A protein has these predicted regions:
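Short loop/turn motifs enriched for small/polar and acidic residues
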Residues: 81, 167-170
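N-terminal helical capping/dimerization or prosegment-like subdomains
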Residues: 17-114
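Active-site metal-coordination/substrate-binding segment of hydrolases
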Residues: 97-168
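Short, Lys/Arg-enriched N-terminal segments with co-localized hydrophobic residues
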Residues: 2-15
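General helical structural elements
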Residues: 11-12, 38, 138, 152
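N-terminal low-complexity, intrinsically disordered patches enriched in charged
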Residues: 8-11, 54, 116, 142-144
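General helical secondary-structure elements
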Residues: 3-4, 30, 39, 130
């Protein structure tokens, strides 16, 4: 019934790939591309609290919608709201399977006071196996993880195991 403690994977990726060798191969082959994509996303200064960053908010939304469409989601679109754009996408072809809704936000908080930063907030980098940059932990990292997980499933299985609706807001 479960995995014994001495055989328990120490990392989520290890747990997933132990069950699916094709997924493990895909994740290994795309590791560098996934990291570069993540860093590219983090470079967008999508600060929602600053009206002068409205163009960056829009650019982040369009970047996400383009990624969703590229990896196989249908109806990937940016919808205007009175405040900030919402990105919506879906894939609804897992007949009989549940529908899962994934929500994240792609905006970040202002960086002021900038003089307290020891690194440039929108020039992300990897240090000691960790990605450092504004939004890496809240919430661009989680959002990007959802994109890459779906991409890996589309690439290795040609489909998702559930119906999936995506809602990302700025």
């Amino acid at each position: 019934a479960g995995v014994s403690p001495e055989r328990r994977p120490t990392h989520v990726e290890d747990a997933m790939t132990a069950l699916d060798p094709a997924l493990a191969e895909h994740l290994d082959a795309t590791k560098d591309a996934r990291l570069e994509s993540y860093l590219e996303f983090l470079r967008i200064p999508s600060i929602s609290a600053l009206p002068e960053r409205a163009g960056d908010i829009r650019r982040a939304a369009e970047w996400i919608a383009a990624e969703l469409a590229r990896i196989g989601f249908e109806h990937a679109e940016v919808s205007e709201t009175p405040w900030l754009p919402i990105v919506y996408a879906d894939w609804l072809h897992a007949e009989g399977a549940p529908t899962v809704i994934v929500y994240c936000h792609y905006d970040v908080q202002p960086v002021d006071p900038i003089e307290l930063w020891t690194t440039a907030p929108f020039d992300p980098f990897v240090r000691d196996g960790r990605v450092i940059g504004r939004g890496a932990a809240d919430d661009k990292g989680q959002l990007h993880m959802h994109l890459r997980a779906a991409e890996a499933l589309f690439a290795t299985r040609g489909r998702l195991p559930v119906n999936l609706r995506i809602v990302f807001e700025g």
